[in-house]
Amino acid sequence: MAEEGITAGGVMDVNTALQEVLKTALIHDGLARGIREAAKALDKRQAHLCVLASNCDEPMYVKLVEALCAEHQINLIKVDDNKKLGEWVGLCKIDREGKPRKVVGCSCVVVKDYGKESQAKDVIEEYFKCKK
């Protein structure tokens, strides 16, 4: 699970950093969304980071993604909710007030290209260094 309370230098927790990284990667066309795109990116070793929803309703998806990440030594983060993950990676409509609506759940996302160097990327990388 992506712990919420972890702060790197008291600046940004892992969930906030993850949202920033996903947003930047989305802008730079560096995301593979959904199990098919994600599995292809993982298999081709194009992935820097994989994000998996804990509430994925298909256990074989989870096994496949976890196995591919383990096989190719790709960092894996789990988030609580597939709707939240779908919102973070742009699988929704934004209404006039800027609030997301018609959010589509997304069980798996792979970051193929971070887009640019950022503090959020450093926080995520530091998180994985601490986990090892």
From Swiss-Prot:
GO terms for biological process: maintenance of translational fidelity; positive regulation of canonical Wnt signaling pathway; ribosomal small subunit biogenesis. It holds the Pfam family Ribosomal_L7Ae. Its main location: nucleus. It is found in: Nucleus, Nucleolus. InterPro entries: Ribosomal_eL30-like_sf, Ribosomal_eL8/eL30/eS12/Gad45, Ribosomal_eS12, Ribosomal_eS12_CS. One of its GO terms (molecular function) is structural constituent of ribosome. One of its GO terms (cellular component) is small-subunit processome. Keywords: Nucleus, Ribonucleoprotein, Ribosomal protein. It comes from the Eukaryota. Gene3D superfamilies: 3.30.1330.30. Belongs to the eukaryotic ribosomal protein eS12 family. Part of the small subunit (SSU) processome, first precursor of the small eukaryotic ribosomal subunit. During the assembly of the SSU processome in the nucleolus, many ribosome biogenesis factors, an RNA chaperone and ribosomal proteins associate with the nascent pre-rRNA and work in concert to generate RNA folding, modifications, rearrangements and cleavage as well as targeted degradation of pre-ribosomal RNA by the RNA exosome. Subunit of the 40S ribosomal complex. Part of the small subunit (SSU) processome, composed of more than 70 proteins and the RNA chaperone small nucleolar RNA (snoRNA) U3. Subunit of the 40S ribosomal complex. This is Small ribosomal subunit protein eS12. It comes from Gallus gallus (Chicken).
